[in-house]
Regions:
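Divalent metal-cofactor coordination and adjacent catalytic microenvironments
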Residues: 1-181
Length: 181
């Protein structure tokens, strides 16, 4: 399980970029468009298996993982801390130098602490993950979603022929998708 510790400081698309794509000139729908930008980013992150933009997360594991441990949040930029909770409830933070971020977003721990780990929430890893730059393809995919959601605000489209935008969202993101191994 993982949870976000810090929120994005900015979205990968500016409000003005989305409004230009939507051909919206007034400020009446700015709050809605801002929410659509966030939702499109989150959908893109889910599809890609990558975080956009960089921020901090906690990964909580129920046992000591096998090494090297492939971090589920990509791309991993740094590992700030690794804290182990033992059976008696005490917490042991691994010291700097006993763990490291290796190639391919893998965490390497030289040695786990003495003692039996707790059977749930045994390891908490604090990691910074995310992209610094967003490729144009990713932005275009997000704009396609935003445009679709802005025009179709209900979950059912009645009275129209429904079809997928040819070569749309998935085609733009597919080359950079990370499939868990």
């Amino acid at each position: 399980m993982w949870r976000q510790k810090t929120s994005p400081t900015a979205e990968p698309l500016a409000l003005e970029e989305a409004k230009l794509h939507l051909r919206v000139e007034n400020a009446e729908d700015d709050a809605l468009i801002g929410a659509l930008i966030s939702a499109a980013r989150e959908s893109s992150e889910t599809f890609l298996g990558r975080m956009i933009p960089e921020r901090q997360f906690e990964i909580v594991l129920d046992r000591y993982p096998e090494m090297p441990y492939r971090l589920p949040l990509l791309p991993a930029k740094s590992v700030e801390s690794v804290v182990c909770t033992l059976e008696d409830g005490s917490e042991v933070g691994l010291t700097e130098g006993t763990f490291r971020l290796a190639a391919d977003d893998r965490l390497v721990v030289d040695a786990w602490p003495e003692g039996t780990p707790r059977t749930y929430d045994a390891v908490t890893i604090t990691v910074t993950a995310g992209t610094e730059t967003v490729p144009a393809r990713w932005k275009q995919a997000m704009l396609l979603l935003i445009g679709h959601w802005y025009e179709h605000r209900e979950s059912v489209n009645v009275g129209n022929i429904v079809n997928e935008v040819p070569q749309g969202f998935e085609m733009l993101l597919w080359p950079d998708r990370v499939v868990p191994s």
